[in-house]
Amino acid sequence: MTITDLVLILFIAALLAYALYDQFIMPRRNGPTLLSIALLRRGRIDSVIFVGLVAILIYNNVTSHGAQMTTWLLSALALMGFYIFWIRTPRIIFKQRGFFFANVWIEYNRIKEMNLSEDGVLVMQLEQRRLLIRVRNIDDLEKIYKLLIENQ
């Protein structure tokens, strides 16, 4: 096994750990989930570039008769990238004392002000940071509003 294979295994393990944390562990942290809302995906161009570069590496490894193990590991990396970028949906998860946004726990008392833009983006101003929450379904904004009113 080469150093390349070890690095690929490390990246695959990291992506798998992230996917498991995001899908199974994070919703169970910090109490029961009160509301889970699907968000819009960010630009997919980065994911297209990543999967495209991995596909080029697979092609290069196959045409140069590289190690078959490396080809399988590159294929697994491409599949993990495909899952994380295209199948998994980003979510905002509301709990009793706060919420998870982009895998970061934010308590409700950190919210200094909230606004709704004309194009349906909920803007939450924290102490030093602004969160732009783009929901997939515009009706979910009302659910978020009701939940925040009940918990504040």
From Swiss-Prot:
GO cellular component term, pick one: plasma membrane
Transmembrane annotation, as ranges: 6-26, 45-65, 67-87
Transmembrane is among the record's keywords: yes
Membrane topology: Multi-pass membrane protein
UniProt keyword annotations, A-Z: Cell inner membrane, Cell membrane, Membrane, Transmembrane, Transmembrane helix
UniProt xrefs under InterPro entries: DUF986
Subcellular location: Cell inner membrane
NCBIfam families: PRK02913.1
Annotated protein name in UniProt: UPF0266 membrane protein YobD
Organism: Salmonella typhi
